[in-house]
Swiss-Prot record:
Example GO biological process: mRNA splicing, via spliceosome
Pro residues compositional bias, start-end: 217-230
Keywords per UniProt: Nucleus, Phosphoprotein, Repeat, RNA-binding
Species this protein is from: Pongo abelii (Sumatran orangutan)
Bias (Acidic residues) ranges: 231-252
GO CC annotation terms, alphabetical: U12-type spliceosomal complex
Biological function: Participates in pre-mRNA U12-dependent splicing, performed by the minor spliceosome which removes U12-type introns. U12-type introns comprises less than 1% of all non-coding sequences. Binds to the 3'-stem-loop of m(7)G-capped U12 snRNA.
Basic and acidic residues bias spans: 115-130
Protein's name according to its UniProt entry: RNA-binding region-containing protein 3
Subcellular location: Nucleus
Length: 517
């Protein structure tokens, strides 16, 4: 006879690795990086909430700190929990979930009892029941697990909302105004549904269901029963009347709900805007002639006439040619004028008859004046500047000695040997001879012809000597005064540097010859 089978020895500790790995696959997960704020009980409840059958939480120290082993009833439940828990952010920590390896199975929890394992392997019907029970407890089958609603949905529950009305919409608007979160969620929903934004002007009111509510038609008059039909008993009459009422109410409700759903699904029709063609009216000549004046914007400002704003065109005519002769008349003219004055005085002493006799005829004829002399006088007057700079303006436009020391142009400044010719440098590009004549003309007496001829200005505008000038003055005294007053005067944004010229030769006088300064 065969020897009786000996029972397998089972240790008191954890079972072997073969007991942890069922033939269908592994069902133990290793959960890492659990939050330290949670206690061991809270960690165990968390993993059991995701369908774990048994949980073992390890200590908060060592290599496997803040970790836990979770055993699930089967491989599918373990895979589903892994997809839900892996990379889940919890209290600032990101969970890392993986299947437990063979080297880590020493720390895995032991099954609660051997009888449960035998029951699962022997009875597949009970295993299916457990699956169904776990299915109701998992997170995916809940109503809103993110908000804490984990109980399952009722499959028999259906919602049927009434169509929108003015009172319902008013209540919704009041709720939007009182609950800011609800208002924000409504805006999010409108954005997702690509609805127009409500931030613009008020849109047209869509057609409401209340406007299309059908009025109940009056019931048709009941015809009297024919005498041929025998009257029914009272019980049959009551049953038939109840059945007809039930059928009529059901049909009315169905028709009413169908109409409500059709109206709810209808989109609001926007009113069509009819564009009116504007016919431009032709203006008549009368209207164009009598154009009304535009009212003034304010009564404070007077109305300006075109003559006040624009220059009136002057009539073109024969222009008179005039010669502006200076007061300095030649000696010949003075002698003639003195003779005429003496003659007039003598005529006053003569009787009136003699004076009248002298005035009879074409009058007196004077000799023709010398035109060359008048033209020379005119040229001399053009060369003379009408105005010269004053001493106050020179002092005001000069820079101080402290500023001269800071500028590089005046660092190695030396006035030079005194003579009647000065040298000016550091001139701006826009400087012209008339500007220098305006400044240095105050040191020349233009009434003297010799001094006026000796006054000479040569401005260099090109080449290596650009921005420099030589000014010839009548004498050394005038040159020294000009150097003292004009040195450092700012002309067109640049201070002038005035020095005595090295070789000073005055301009030769054609009448008197060479003169030494």
């Amino acid at each position: 006879m065969a020897a009786p089978e000996q029972p397998l020895a089972i240790s008191r500790g954890c079972t072997s690795s073969s007991s942890l790995s069922p033939p269908r696959g592994d069902r133990t997960l290793l959960v890492r990086h659990l939050p330290a704020e949670l206690t061991a009980e809270e960690k165990e409840d968390l993993l059991k909430y995701f369908g774990a059958q048994s949980v073992r939480v390890l200590s908060d120290k060592g290599r496997l700190k803040h970790t836990a082993f979770a055993t699930f009833p089967n491989e599918k439940a373990a895979i589903k929990a892994l997809t839900r828990l892996h990379q889940l952010k919890l209290l600032g920590h990101t969970l890392v979930v993986e299947f437990a390896k063979e080297q880590d199975r020493v720390h895995s929890p032991c099954p609660t009892s051997g009888s449960e394992k035998k029951k699962r392997s022997d009875d597949p019907v009970e295993d299916d029941k457990e699956k169904k029970e776990l299915g109701y407890l998992t997170v995916e089958n809940g109503i809103a697990p993110n908000h804490g609603l984990t109980f399952p949905l009722n499959s028999c529950l259906k919602y049927m909302y009434p169509p929108p009305s003015s009172t319902i919409l008013a209540n919704i608007v009041n709720a939007l105004a009182s609950v800011p979160k609800f208002y924000v969620q409504v805006l999010h929903l409108m954005n997702k549904m690509n609805l127009p934004t409500p931030f613009g002007p008020i849109t047209a009111r869509p057609p409401m269901y209340e406007d299309y509510m059908p009025l109940h038609a009056p019931l048709p008059p009941t015809s009297p029963q024919p005498p041929e039909e025998p009257p029914l008993p009272e019980e049959d009459e009551e049953l038939s009347s109840e059945e007809s009422e039930y059928e009529s109410t059901d049909d009315e409700d169905r028709q009413r709900m169908n109409k409500l759903m059709e109206l709810a699904n209808l989109q609001p029709k926007r009113p069509k805007t009819i564009k009116q063609r504007h016919v431009r009216k032709k203006r008549k000549i009368k209207d164009m002639l009598n154009t009304p004046l535009c009212p003034s914007h304010s009564s404070l400002h007077p109305v300006l006439l075109p003559s006040d704003v624009f220059d009136q065109p002057q009539p073109v005519g024969n222009k008179r040619i005039e010669f502006h002769i200076s007061t300095d008349m030649p000696a010949a003219f003075k002698k003639d004028l003195e003779k005429e004055q003496n003659c007039e005085e003598k005529n006053h002493d003569l009787p009136a008859t003699e004076v009248d006799a002298s005035n009879i005829g074409f009058g007196k004829i004077f000799p023709k004046p010398n035109l060359d002399i008048t033209e020379e006088i005119k040229e001399d007057s053009d060369e003379m500047p009408s105005e010269c700079i004053s001493r106050r303006e020179l002092e005001k436009g000069r820079i101080s000695r402290e500023e001269m020391e800071t500028l590089s142009v005046f660092r190695s400044y030396e006035p030079g040997e005194p003579n009647c010719r000065i040298y000016v440098k550091n001139l701006a590009k826009h400087v012209e001879e008339k500007d220098l004549k305006y400044i240095f003309g105050r040191y020349v007496d233009f009434s003297s012809e010799t001094r006026r001829i000796m006054f000479d200005i040569r401005l260099m505008k090109e080449g290596r000597m650009k921005g420099q000038a030589f000014v010839g003055l009548p004498n050394e005294k005038a040159a020294a005064k000009a150097l003292k007053e004009a040195n450092g005067y700012v002309l067109f944004g640049k201070p002038m540097v005035v020095q005595f010229a090295r070789s000073a030769r005055p301009k030769q006088d054609p009448k008197e010859g060479k003169r030494k300064c």
